[in-house]
């Protein structure tokens, strides 16, 4: 999830950079 976006119920939440946060809940871009 590096340089990905946290997927929120309303769409896309703020950018996520931490790999421990960017996983299945992030769309990789």
Curated annotation (Swiss-Prot):
Gene3D superfamilies: Knottin, scorpion toxin-like
Task of the protein: Excitatory insect beta-toxins induce a spastic paralysis. They bind voltage-independently at site-4 of sodium channels (Nav) and shift the voltage of activation toward more negative potentials thereby affecting sodium channel activation and promoting spontaneous and repetitive firing. The fraction to which this protein belongs exhibits low toxicity and induces transient paralysis in all insects tested (the crickets A.domesticus).
Localization per record: Secreted
Source superkingdom: Eukaryota
UniProt KW keywords: Disulfide bond, Ion channel impairing toxin, Neurotoxin, Secreted, Toxin, Voltage-gated sodium channel impairing toxin
InterPro entries according to UniProt: LCN-type_CS_alpha_beta_dom, Scorpion_toxin-like_sf
Key word Secreted present: yes
Domain notes: Has the structural arrangement of an alpha-helix connected to antiparallel beta-sheets by disulfide bonds (CS-alpha/beta).
Family from the record: Belongs to the long (4 C-C) scorpion toxin superfamily. Sodium channel inhibitor family. Beta subfamily.
Protein name: Toxin Bl-4
One Gene Ontology term, aspect cellular component: extracellular region
GO molecular function term, any single one: ion channel inhibitor activity
Source organism (scientific name): Buthacus leptochelys
